[in-house]
């Protein structure tokens, strides 16, 4: 077990891929904002890549260990110290009973991850241990960790000394500028050609009013297509309003003139258009960005997004350990290639489904 001495700014229990299949119930996946760093932390301590671990935001916690344990720290460098002695990131470390791990502020990047051999043993909620702060579920009492709490851990048989290859570590931006991939849709036809060019050729500043629900961006004004300006009144008065529809995770919805990227704890539906979506393989960049950083967006195809996801899955495995050989990597690639690509969503069918759901809900309310 581990005792929380100082909680940090917002340190929470997360697992990967989080709470899957619950959007229909109104619950987002949650999970780590930077799943690349998160999974590698678990690989280092010989856990399954998705085992529950700690996500530390901006300022890390201080923890006291009640038993011997193997740990690994990845992601943003929060200058971890064990009993006052600096310890490295991206490798597994042995911690003895009564030793204290102290973490500070991140200078490059925003989130650090602490994985414990055996994983964190909190009670799953809807199939996941991930903390969803807004609803107060998952993690420890549904909140970020607090001083005095005990973090329960599973038994483990891991050893120290495992390291991640340098070329498998995500490269953090040191100039506060991030290039983020996006896929068009589902409502790209509500924005005109001028609006699309503006979005892809502009820098977008991450506002301070951003969290795990949504990233608010500041930038130029959008322009809209005739579909948005000559729509029916049921869609709302502003061009970016639309009949309530389902949101994909990573949706960039347009609230008036403000783009908001709906991240891990974002809503499952709403009444704003979504001209672009950030694919899952690019989420780690969002997770390591701080308010004041800027994004420029690069459009890619759905097929390219799927390829990036598959490549990242290969990296987030034991193939990235320093001791791994080429044969291990080839075996892992063959395993990944057996996984069928997710079929591209038919947004025409999606729109029809959401419209039908809206009409059914309205009729039910009218009967009441």
Spans of features found by a protein language model:
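Single conserved hydrophobic/aromatic residue that forms the stacking wall/gate
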Residues: 349-368
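Conserved "landmark" site that anchors the functional core of diverse proteins
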Residues: 1-351
